Amino acid sequence: MDRIRIVGGRTLEGTIKISGAKNAALPLMIASLLTSETLTLENVPALADVNMLLRILGHHGVDYSVNGRRAGEEPHASRAIHLTAGTIVDIMAPYDLVSKMRASFWVIAPLLARMGEARVSLPGGCAIGTRPVDLLLMVLEKLGAKIEIEAGYVHAKAPKGLHGAEITFPKVTVGGTHTALMAASLAQGHTLLVNAAREPEIVDLANCLTKMGAKIKGAGQSTVEIEGVGRLSGASHKVLPDRIEAGTYAIAVAMAGGDVLLEGAEADLLQTALDTIEQAGARISVTNEGIRVRRNGAGLQPVDVTTAPFPGFPTDLQAQFMALMTKAKGSSTITETIFENRFMHVQELARLGAHIRLEGDAAIVEGVETLQGAPVMATDLRASVSLVIAALAAQGETMVNRVYHLDRGFEHLEEKLGRCGAIIERISGTA
């Protein structure tokens, strides 16, 4: 099992090219099941989750090709993936595949919409709370599906097809909104979504579906309208830049100090996070090329943060920002409102010398003068990168174990940081 070794104390200088967004790429890939024609996605990041989803789609009969690295390309060069679901060969998504990645459960919507039936295992993935699929199933039931759950599988049927409906989400749900957009695009009639998620990745999916022939109005707003169509066609679409990756590297620069251009990053996708990082002491400017992040020797300031749906502070940057606050001059409170059990990184940050105490859904971080390198263990995707950020500013060597979590969501992280001066290396095959 790979590990990542980091020696702290180096500032970051240079350029980091921001990859395509994982959280956009996965539902876009799943949308290929909605049509028998070819969907081409550009700027797809090279990640373990992307590769796993390709396996799952292949199981259902999707033919795909991937333009990988070519000689002379940057190691983080984007990929184009061509997906053709000419014939769906299996409406069942088995446990051994779905259990490895929760987002793969979303195949239930296009399979049901196109084939009238789907049987999908209940999901796995990061161990962050329960992440119930109830809201996704509520969407399908509202659209006319009959749902049965038995032996760990969800069996959804709509033999006469789905029909439009008014769906009011009891709380904002990204997965539920993705599900509704895909299923309602092939449903008969009009669908109205109330309290829909507004995340940029939702807008990206809606834009792609529109290119495929869907009729969607209002994506990115809390009320969305979908007029169902009889069929969807192929299309080409470029995945939007990863706002979580951009925010992560912005926090890394704020932590380590230095001057880095986040090439291709779009500020309007993460403005709340950028404002918060700036309050903590970084200097941020938007250029034609991306986002420039700087911090000189000035100390970090404590900032209270509460996670919230877009356009609020992203839950997927909570762990990274907590790592930053471990070095702030004073006390900060970080409140998690999206997921339960998303403080698993606290114990590992404490191994580096962080002072953090938990009070319900809040973490109180008392900044310390010095962090000290130590062996630590990644527990999930975002927690793992928070340990890397802390290690950049720690004295001595930190060894991050279980980095397969990092590979699920960060493309060539050690190469990108290493090019900016970090002392970081991957050690392969070590238990």
Curated annotation (Swiss-Prot):
It catalyses: phosphoenolpyruvate + UDP-N-acetyl-alpha-D-glucosamine = UDP-N-acetyl-3-O-(1-carboxyvinyl)-alpha-D-glucosamine + phosphate. UDP-N-acetyl-alpha-D-glucosamine binds at R102, R131, P132, V133, D134, L135, D316, I338. Keywords: Cell cycle, Cell division, Cell shape, Cell wall biogenesis/degradation, Cytoplasm, Peptidoglycan synthesis, Pyruvate, Transferase. Its main location: cytoplasm. GO terms for biological process: cell division; cell wall organization; peptidoglycan biosynthetic process; regulation of cell shape; UDP-N-acetylgalactosamine biosynthetic process. It holds the Pfam family EPSP_synthase. Phosphoenolpyruvate binds at K22, N23. It is an enzyme of class 2 (transferase). It comes from the Bacteria. Its EC number is 2.5.1.7. InterPro entries: Enolpyruvate_Tfrase_dom (IPR001986), Enolpyruvate_Tfrase_sf (IPR036968), MurA_subfamily (IPR050068), RNA3'P_cycl/enolpyr_Trfase_a/b (IPR013792), UDP_GlcNAc_COvinyl_MurA (IPR005750). It is found in: Cytoplasm. HAMAP family: MurA. This is UDP-N-acetylglucosamine 1-carboxyvinyltransferase. It comes from Beijerinckia indica subsp. indica (strain ATCC 9039 / DSM 1715 / NCIMB 8712). The lineage of its organism: Bacteria, Pseudomonadati, Pseudomonadota, Alphaproteobacteria, Hyphomicrobiales. The gene is murA.
